[in-house]
Amino acid sequence: MTQAARRDCDVLIVGGGAVGSALACALARLPLDTVLVEAQEVRQLSQPSFDTRVTALANGSQQILASLGLWPQLKGYTEAIRTIHISERGRFGAARISAAEADVPALGYTVENQALGRVLWERLRDAPRFTALAPAKVTAIHRDERCVTATIEQAGETRDLRAKLVVAADGARSAVRTALGFDALEHDYEQRAVIFNCATEAPPAGRAFERFTQRGPIALLPLTSGRTGVIWTLPSAVAAEIAALPDDAFRAELQTAFGYRLGRFTRMGARHLHTLVRIASGAVHGPRAVLIGDAALRLHPVAGQGFNLALRDVATLAEVLVDAIEAVGGTDDVGASEPLDRYAAWRAADRERVSTFTHGLIRLFGESLPGMGLGRGIGLVAFDLLPGAKALLARQTMGKAGRLPRLARGLPLS
């Protein structure tokens, strides 16, 4: 990796969080000059993408990271998810998905975001054709049929950089998406997530929980050292008030909502509030530009699918670019329309499937019409007794549904 200025590159990635840096790691194996622009100082790993929150890596995402050679460095920071328990507070019926039933070592893994960021950026330090501009920001973007020209501000200086392709990986409020003229539709769930780590009397021991309540879902994830990560979704009107309660009062509220499947909640970590919205870009590509991760589609966190969907964006984009390179025998034009059209068409079904799944869960378990609670309970019991239904959901949860890119199948890019 170099910090030296470049005036031209093949690929410009805007956004150096987990998604942008994962793409840079994938492209580092290709004969491409890649520049990444990140607003924060990456050496400090202080950007919001790499805070103390936890990411749930699906089984398929673990395979992508393993195919990129990152898993040996990351594995020591992860905890396996071997079962997922799904239930609704105050209703009978529950469903369980297990790694044993799916015939995999784990349904997924949890990892703290800071550890993920550290591993990704350590890999990029050794990438010879990779340049990081950080802290820096893109202040303007112009496109023509030959290239993208980005105006970059860094350390009080401004310069232009030309690229054959620009990749927006700068999150749900993507400035690049706006600058490129992409429209986006936003749905406000009128909910906020209280996110924190805690300890419980009984360690989670590889068990994850999705508990639906009248106020919103509670997700518990197993962490290293016997800790538990919690994502508690609450109505916006009460979330800040509950999050600000003293520890004892907050613990009592959480205990009432979740129950005692892990015994009593004991130590509580710092709480962080996040507003929950669904933001979908009307298009994910255009001339010499492509959107990935939250810049393309921001999801509700109910099923923990956001980063996993983004990693499949990364794996698919890397694959279509390497195929384009090999088809012409060089890096003549990685921003041509054909590979970007192929990328967008490939990713459309996965995005639609995951978006419908997560949005549908919120609507289903948020409905309070008479008889709906009973119907959901019966549905959970029936689901738990139907191997075919469980296998289908397991594939979706593990990121194994639909057509998969080579990295997700354990194959090299080329």
What are the language-model segments listed below?
Residues G16, D170-G171, L299:
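Glycine-rich, N-terminal phosphate-binding loop of Rossmann-like dinucleotide-binding domains
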Residues A28-F50:
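Glycine-rich FAD pyrophosphate-binding loop
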Residues S49-R89:
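N-terminal FAD cofactor-binding segment of flavoenzymes
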Residues A240-G335:
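FAD/FMN-dependent oxidoreductases across multiple families
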Residues E319-S414:
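C-terminal helical "tail/cap" subdomain of flavin- and related membrane-associated enzymes
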